[in-house]
Amino acid sequence: MQMANRPAGDPTLSRHVRRATRADAGAMQRLLRMGVYVHVHVDWHLPGDWLGTPGFVVYTRGDDSPGERVAACLGIGADPLPAAWVRVAAVESAAAFAQCEAMWTAIVADLDPDIEEVAWFVTDNWPLHWLDRLGLEPVSTVLSFRKGDLTAAPYTPPPGLDIRPALIEELPLLAEMEAAAFEPRWRHSAQSLYLAWRQSLSFDVALLDGQPVGFQFSTGGGGGAHLARMTVQPERQGQGIGAALLARALEGYRQRKLRGVTLNTQADNLASQRLYERFGFAPTGHEYPVWSYYPTPG
């Protein structure tokens, strides 16, 4: 994992900001449970995974010992570079913008020079009152889709296509495929793919002539499935590989006797939306904006 780093900030508030340590785990959990405003980035990492890394800071009241009162926390991490996400944010007071601003200033004052973007996946309304003031701007929207049954639409796969469960040794190749297929903020690293491989409901790879050309992984919960990722090698897109992977995923859900499936996709990814709608997915009406901060080069 790569993290944004080097705390610094407003001279009147920066003295309250320090890097989070493993000793802050209990305070962080308290904030996540009891905080007025809480954000946790949804992926395969847990919030505690980022403790002790540069870019995860806390705002404290009292002295500088690990036992002082932690009033807020903010963690930013890149996995992989060059884009970072806001991984966790929590404050115990609704009037805590100044605290958040001090933590944000501390983090972005001296980011890892390889970080080109810091993005916030907005799942609640409260960050929208702060993001513009912190210097972020809206860059994308994620749409949610749902399918109430698990039937597959007719499709024609390319000759010789084979789909099977992914092997751990294939994950670095799949990470390279991610880098080729997506802009930085949406990519998974080999480490993130490993976490998905360990925890997912299904993780399938599509092969042509023995070489990976696409993959999907899914999660389950509440009696349903969630298609968490679908990636196809850019030069192979439009050849039926995504449809074949989707059909195989639906077959796996049926075998597990799941009921329905959800997925998310970017509003500007029209090709994926056409595929999902052809398979019977419909928009749920839920939309999630993405805001980003772009450090000034140099």
Q: How would you name each of these model-derived features?
A:
Residues 1-8, 78-82, 91-159, 289-291:
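Acyl-donor-binding surface of acyltransferase catalytic domains
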Residues 8-28, 162-174:
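A short beta-loop-alpha structural element at the N-terminal edge
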Residues 38-44, 157-225:
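Flexible, substrate/cofactor-facing loop regions flanked by secondary structure
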Residues 95-109, 232, 238-251, 255, ...:
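Conserved acetyl-CoA-binding loop-helix of GNAT-fold acetyltransferases
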Residues 118-121, 227, 261-265:
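Conserved hydrophobic beta-strand within the GNAT/NAT acetyltransferase core sheet
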Residues 122-140, 239, 243, 267-285:
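Conserved active-site alpha-helix within GNAT-family acetyltransferase domains
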Residues 143-161, 259, 264-270, 282, ...:
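C-terminal "cap" of GNAT-fold acetyltransferases
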